[in-house]
């Protein structure tokens, strides 16, 4: 006889922060009767999802990858940004074996060192300080042909803010005496994660052949021309930068290609296009044999040297539930599916025993302000059915809308996104009530609560460092103040009556009144 489950659901409202300032605050201005009622009726508070509380530098805004690793592991996880920055400060970076080997082999063969990555101070997918350290190290080890392929941000930074970074690197290469910016392209193309290979192919052709929609003799000139075409940083068309003789850079056999993004999800597709022999996402005109190095581990099936391999996290929530014979479901749309699976499980691809997964396809639109509800209705249909099936002890669900629509900078669309999510939460809470289940509602980081930059007046498309909501829809309870994302997994185990493993340093935040 099958035991009926009374599930605990964790609803992660991506990009849903709390901000006192109501100006251009899409969450405040949205009509959210369900969340208003739940906040009035149940125990609630605010927790931290940024900075030192999630293993990032002090004051650094949170992000989805970091947030889900902390949520799932039940401990503050030392993030790649902090780890690599520390290695640079300690002069360990310049001795990194994977990076040194790639440079040395290229130099010995008379080849070039190509460095690609998101040229941004955003700190979400990369940091330009890391890219600078790599350029300096390559020249210091004897490389005379150093080519930087700059992916432009405008998403975790203001929409038109790349000029300072490009100017800085022009000056850097002048100071070093070798190297140059070889190409620029928006992250929309180079860092797609939704199998839109027509975008990725443009970045691939640009890096391998110097084949581009536009050609300029200077990166800042190329950027200014993009702005004239009304392209913000994120959407800058492929632009090859020529040398003093009018030649473009190309990727050749024996060259080194070093990918300086440290976050995995938006690095995987373009990486596979370079290294997979059986790659079929698009027709590759050339397939140069290069020494490809990734800064961190992007996926278990990506076979390339890794400068900073992942630290092994044991006894994450998923693993503990498996070891205790519990069942669990992970569910989200394409855009955040990796976050409720790979990242929530501490960087492990394979599901745990008793872990089911449901992937809902995100809508195929150019930008999500065109469909702010995304696939939330279908996602909720599947989630409600899973609750009603009484198969699961724990359900982890991510609603991507607040973040994905927040990133577009479209205030009205972000309001609609929040309203769509609120309606879905109502359905989920009702379904849980019918089976005696309980629910924690929180977020991984802020975004939609700030849709304009108060200083520049530009659209605010980045994450924030605001606190995020923490609501317990269940038994009468109190919630501790001062919580953080790493307290969520221990809280779930505590509510289930399970012991918390020693590796989880977070503390239960919810205390049920007897």
From Swiss-Prot:
Protein transport as a keyword of this entry, yes or no, is: no
Q: Where does substrate bind?
A: 125, 155-156, 187, 193, 263-266, 336
Q: Which reaction equation describes what this protein catalyses?
A: (2R)-2-phosphoglycerate = (2R)-3-phosphoglycerate
Q: What is its EC number?
A: 5.4.2.12
How many cofactor units bind, and how? Binds 2 manganese ions per subunit.
Q: Which SUPFAM superfamilies match?
A: 2,3-Bisphosphoglycerate-independent phosphoglycerate mutase, substrate-binding domain, Alkaline phosphatase-like
Sites where the protein binds Mn(2+) 1: 403, 407, 463
What does the record give as its pathway?
A: Carbohydrate degradation; glycolysis; pyruvate from D-glyceraldehyde 3-phosphate: step 3/5
According to the UniProt record, what class of enzyme is this?
Answer: isomerase
Q: Which GO MF terms does the UniProt record name?
A: manganese ion binding; phosphoglycerate mutase activity
State how it assembles: Monomer.
**What is the protein named?**
2,3-bisphosphoglycerate-independent phosphoglycerate mutase
Query: What's the source species for this entry?
Result: Shewanella sp. (strain MR-4)
From the UniProt record, report the name of the gene that encodes this protein: gpmI
């Amino acid at each position: 006889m099958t035991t009926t489950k009374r599930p605990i659901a964790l609803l992660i409202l991506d990009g849903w922060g709390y901000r006192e300032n109501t100006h251009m605050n899409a969450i405040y201005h949205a009509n959210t009767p369900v969340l208003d009622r739940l906040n009035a009726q149940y125990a609630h508070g605010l927790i931290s999802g940024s900075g030192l509380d999630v293993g990032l530098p002090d004051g650094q805004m949170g992000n989805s990858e970091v947030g889900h690793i902390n949520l799932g592991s039940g401990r503050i996880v030392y993030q790649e940004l902090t780890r690599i920055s520390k290695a640079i400060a300690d002069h360990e970076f310049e001795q990194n074996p994977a990076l040194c080997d790639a440079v040395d082999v290229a130099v010995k063969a008379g080849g070039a060192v190509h460095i690609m990555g998101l040229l941004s101070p955003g700190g979400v997918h990369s940091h330009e300080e890391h890219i600078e350290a790599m350029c300096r190290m390559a020249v210091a080890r004897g490389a005379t042909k150093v080519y930087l392929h700059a992916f432009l941000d405008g998403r975790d930074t203001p929409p038109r803010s790349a000029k300072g970074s490009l100017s800085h690197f022009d000056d850097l290469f002048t100071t070093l005496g070798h190297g140059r910016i070889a190409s620029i392209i928006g992250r929309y193309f180079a860092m797609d994660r939704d199998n839109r290979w027509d975008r990725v192919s443009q970045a691939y052709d640009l890096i391998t052949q110097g084949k581009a929609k536009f050609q300029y003799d200077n990166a800042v000139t190329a950027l200014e021309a993009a702005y004239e075409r009304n392209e913000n940083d994120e959407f800058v068309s492929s632009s090859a930068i020529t040398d003093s003789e009018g030649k473009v850079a190309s990727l050749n056999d024996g060259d080194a290609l070093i990918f300086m993004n440290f976050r995995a999800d938006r690095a995987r597709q373009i990486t596979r296009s370079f290294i997979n022999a059986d790659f079929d996402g698009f027709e590759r005109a050339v397939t140069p044999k290069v020494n490809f190095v990734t800064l961190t581990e992007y996926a278990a099936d990506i076979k390339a040297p890794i400068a900073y391999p992942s630290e092994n996290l044991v006894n994450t929530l998923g693993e503990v539930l498996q070891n205790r014979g519990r069942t669990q479901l992970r569910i989200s749309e394409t855009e955040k599916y990796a976050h409720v699976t790979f990242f929530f499980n501490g960087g492990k691809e394979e599901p745990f025993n008793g872990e089911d997964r449901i992937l809902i396809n995100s809508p195929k639109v150019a930008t999500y302000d065109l469909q702010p509800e995304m696939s939330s209705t279908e996602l909720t249909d599947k989630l409600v059915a899973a609750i009603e099936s009484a198969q699961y002890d724990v359900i982890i669900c991510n609603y991507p809308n607040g973040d994905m629509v927040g990133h577009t900078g479209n205030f009205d669309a972000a309001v609609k996104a929040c309203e769509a999510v609120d309606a879905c939460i109502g359905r989920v809470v009702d379904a849980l009530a019918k089976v005696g289940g309980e629910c924690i509602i929180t977020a991984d980081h802020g975004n939609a609560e700030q849709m304009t930059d108060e200083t520049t007046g530009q659209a605010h498309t980045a994450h924030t460092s605001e606190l995020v909501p923490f609501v317990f829809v269940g038994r009468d309870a109190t919630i501790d103040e001062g919580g953080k994302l790493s307290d969520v997994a221990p809280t779930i185990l505590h509510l289930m009556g399970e012991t918390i493993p020693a590796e989880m340093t977070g503390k239960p935040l919810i205390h049920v009144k007897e």
